[in-house]
């Protein structure tokens, strides 16, 4: 899949909690300290990995790294299918502070790739469904394709990137 762009200011706020927050505070106090930068990047990568796992998504050899200077996540591993791969990538990218995800994953079972859509103000899943499928009533297909990251079809936010499965 390569490099996927995300809205850096939108998404889950993972870096403001726990160890990731403490490491980021250390870097801000001494931005020239390479060890502190590496520790902060490691803590951020671990926070994203924990978030992916909290969504009950897994892949063989799943590894997530974060480069704070470039606001880029790199994800490695072998997903069981294309949908899981895409959901893991979305979990990595729909995080405040992440501008890009470098997808280095592969899949056990090859399937057609979904399209991606970035939510803008005023969007609903019905509106997006009408745009992609010509039928606003197919919004549940988009909702199901983005579970477990979406828990309610009415809870999407500007800047969020969604999977749009093939029609």
Label every PLM stretch briefly:
Residues 38, 119, 132, 149-150:
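A generic helix-loop boundary/linker signal
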Residues 67-74, 79, 108-136, 140:
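Primarily a LysM-type cell-wall glycan-binding module
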